[in-house]
Swiss-Prot record:
Signal peptide: none annotated. PANTHER family: 60S/50S RIBOSOMAL PROTEIN L6/L9, LARGE RIBOSOMAL SUBUNIT PROTEIN UL6M. This is Large ribosomal subunit protein uL6c. It is found in: Plastid, Chloroplast. InterPro entries: Ribosomal_uL6-like, Ribosomal_uL6-like_a/b-dom_sf, Ribosomal_uL6_a/b-dom, Ribosomal_uL6_bac-type, Ribosomal_uL6_CS. HAMAP family: Ribosomal_uL6_B. Gene3D superfamilies: Ribosomal protein L6, alpha-beta domain. Belongs to the universal ribosomal protein uL6 family. One of its GO terms (biological process) is cytoplasmic translation. Keywords: Chloroplast, Plastid, Ribonucleoprotein, Ribosomal protein, RNA-binding, rRNA-binding.
Length: 180
């Protein structure tokens, strides 16, 4: 039995949950999320707690026990508080801006790069170099932030590129060069 899967999830008072078959739906002040749980995973919803249980002792159910509990916990956190990721752009002439709801990046290419965010994801730009990706689904927020970073990942020589806030980029020394 998973150590994480054994933990009980506490429900805040402003949320409502519904469990039909293998689908759980969580509704809160920020929105609604639903997810289909894998076969072999069951839920026990009592008052203001959720317990994730496995039906049987199959290897697959045991492997997915902790994962399912964490996914449900992230759904509850998302619809009550939301998630965000911050990115920074570093480099001379590198900048970003918002046009309608699309993110436009000028990061050293001969063209600008446009990114259209998926539904329920909001992208904000501060000071042309700081980007905030926010939404209720942790998985989608992380995926959009990763997509933005992959357009121009930080390079190790000058550190130019798009990085997560607080990310450490290992720097390298340049080529030694030929002495005269």
């Amino acid at each position: 039995m998973s150590r994480i899967g054994k933990k009980i999830i506490l429900l805040p008072t402003n949320l409502s949950t519904q469990f039909d078959g293998q689908t759980i739906t969580v509704t809160g002040p920020k929105g609604t999320l639903s997810r289909t749980l894998p076969a072999g995973i069951n839920l026990e919803i009592l008052n203001d707690t959720i317990a994730v249980k496995t039906s049987g002792q199959t290897k697959m159910a045991s492997q997915l026990h902790g994962l399912s509990r964490t996914l449900i916990s992230n759904m509850i956190e998302g619809v009550s508080n939301g998630f965000f990721k911050k990115l920074q752009i570093q480099g001379v002439g590198y900048r970003s801006q918002i046009d309608n709801q699309d993110l436009i990046l000028s990061v050293g290419y001969s063209h600008v790069v446009k990114i259209k965010p998926p539904a329920n994801i909001e992208i904000k730009v501060e000071n042309n170099t700081n980007i905030t990706v926010s939404g209720i689904d942790k998985e989608v927020v992380g995926q959009v932030a990763s997509t933005i970073r992959s357009i121009r990942p930080p390079e190790p020589y000058k550190g130019k590129g798009i990085r997560y806030q607080g990310e450490f980029v290992r720097r390298k020394a340049g080529k030694a060069g030929k002495g005269k």
